[in-house]
A protein has these predicted regions:
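Extended alpha-helical scaffold regions
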Residues: 1-196
Length: 196
């Protein structure tokens, strides 16, 4: 129920005591709702509120949320990270689905990228590794360099890159000399100067 999701979101928002005591099985119920077809941004926001409390990451919940989402990745995530799904994303962009419908698949996708990024915030190794499995450096480069992609999505990927690859608990070896990283930085510079 969408109304219940708004109520629960507000009940948990910035409530460190309740958020730190929520049982994994209750988090699982939210993930199950998403898996059962409730791919709406407010369900992702419920998970986000459990992970970030008063602008501070809650490591336990971050780890639980990303673990549960990855376990049901096919049912819970809209990644748009292959040729076929990128074409679908572009169709949704062309019809303005994200502007016409706050519960659109594109808005869900953006909230999901943001959630995964927030699950890695604060250098949570388990979440970083799982997030890196969702989007490789090449995937991020593709997302950033795609002229059809929305600036809102691109900006989320820049933050994802920062939290998941650069600000990590365990350093990603060879990152400083990785050609893809430098291509990403060059692409960010081009995108920033042409789209801002």
């Amino acid at each position: 129920d969408v109304g219940a999701s708004y109520f629960i979101t507000e009940l948990f928002r910035n409530n460190a005591i309740i958020c730190s005591q929520i049982a994994e099985q209750h988090i699982q119920k939210i993930v199950n709702a998403i898996a059962e077809g409730f791919k709406q941004p407010q369900f992702v926001e419920m998970l986000e509120i459990l992970c970030i409390v008063n602008k501070k990451p809650l490591r336990r919940n971050q780890t639980i949320v990303v673990k549960l989402l990855i376990e049901k990745q096919q049912e819970t995530m809209v990644l748009f990270n292959d040729v076929e799904t990128v074409q679908r994303r572009n169709q949704l962009i062309d019809i303005g689905d994200h502007e016409a419908n706050e519960n659109s698949l594109l808005n869900f996708h953006m909230k999901m990228i943001d959630l995964i990024t927030k699950c890695a915030r604060g250098r949570v190794y388990e979440a970083e590794i799982k997030a890196q499995s969702l989007y490789s450096l090449n995937d991020i480069l593709t997302q950033l360099s795609d002229p059809k992609n929305l600036w809102d999505i691109k900006s989320l990927f820049v933050i994802f890159l920062q939290e998941v690859y650069f600000e990590t608990e365990k350093k990603v070896t060879g990152l400083a000399v990785n050609r893809t990283v430098w291509n990403i930085i060059s692409t960010i510079e081009k995108v920033a100067t042409t789209e801002i």
